[in-house]
Amino acid sequence: MLYNRSSFHRPFSLKDKFFNLDLTLMFSIMLLGVISIFAQFSSSGGSFDYYSKSHALRFVIFFILFLVVSFTPISFWHSTSFFIFFILVILLLFVKFYGVQSQGSRRWVNLYIINLQPSELMKIGVILFLSNYYHKISEGDVNKVRFLLYPVVAILAPFILVLSQPDLGTAILILLSGIVVTWLAGVRWKIFAYFSLA
């Protein structure tokens, strides 16, 4: 967790988040990032070449993104989860036809500064979508077949798209993430068995 105090008697404010940052966690992330940059630098024969610069740039960009996400209210992710998931599906479709191809796989979108891999973001996108979906429906509807159609599509669509890149490892992680969230939502095991046999 990014903050020292695990709970507040009121919702987190920006001030609360700033003054309760877990400095140990922040330092650990920065230290690992610096070590990885020096490891890349060393593997390049002591030359700060394209790969070293690219790695350093990605670390800085995603560390800033990490901070932005941490300071963003949870209500924002709750209200935009469906939209985020939809955009990620569009990006996966884009990758399938127009993505950057390397070593037999087509997984990346060229953003000129960096190559973005939507399948990695989809791991989070599936969790956001399903969490919000199950939050919106009543507990009694969780095990009804008609309410399970959306989660099944939301899990299988990105799974199939990522598998076709091909990227088996990421596809399996997306599938497992979806199954775990669905199980935590209260879906019975016999329904999992039914869909597995189907």
Specify the residue positions occupied by each region the protein language model found.
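N-terminal membrane topogenic signal
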Residues: 10-29
